[in-house]
């Protein structure tokens, strides 16, 4: 399977401009025979969107733009798009209202949504303020292959490399 990594420069809050970048990258990748294209974390809304995430209209606009993008992307290529997703359990379980997510778009539809599991809260990062962590391994099936999805920090909890773990769970181990 041919996979492409879209090197994009999303602008925080520019949903239309960011969607255009994703679409153009997917069109080019599709012409080159790519089956799966990856985009950066929160590529649709830009990273870090910070308090824009507290505006319900902005979050709704992200969902709308994601659906529009799904219909515009070439159908020959699957695309993992960095986005946010509403947490349906936020009020009933006292959880955060959003997930930092990757949406799998294939054949004109959002097929699956995957949630970031490890949320950084050190240095300039404050993801725990806005997001609920995912609670399960993220995998999907494409072209007869099982593919695992991690989002940024999910990769960085390797005690073999760092000499210690920063988080209790290791999403990479859960994929194995």
Residue locations for each model-derived region?
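Enzyme catalytic cores with a strong preference for nitrogen-chemistry domains
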Residues: 1-176
């Amino acid at each position: 399977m041919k996979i492409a990594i879209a090197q994009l420069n999303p602008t925080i809050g520019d949903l239309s401009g960011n969607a255009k970048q994703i679409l153009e990258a997917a069109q080019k990748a599709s012409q080159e025979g790519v089956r799966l294209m990856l985009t950066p974390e929160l590529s649709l809304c830009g990273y870090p969107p910070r308090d824009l995430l507290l505006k319900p209209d902005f979050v709704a606009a992200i969902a709308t733009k994601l659906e529009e993008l799904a219909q515009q992307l070439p159908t020959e290529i699957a695309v993992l798009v960095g986005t946010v997703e509403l947490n349906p359990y936020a009020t009933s379980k006292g959880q955060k209202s959003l997930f930092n997510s990757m949406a799998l778009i294939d054949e004109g539809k959002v097929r699956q949504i995957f949630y970031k599991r490890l949320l950084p809260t050190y240095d300039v990062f404050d993801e725990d303020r806005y997001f609920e962590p995912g609670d399960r391994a993220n995998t999907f099936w494409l072209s007869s292959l099982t593919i695992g999805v991690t989002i940024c920090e999910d990769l960085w909890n390797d005690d073999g490399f760092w000499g210690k773990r920063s988080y209790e769970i290791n999403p990479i181990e859960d994929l194995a």
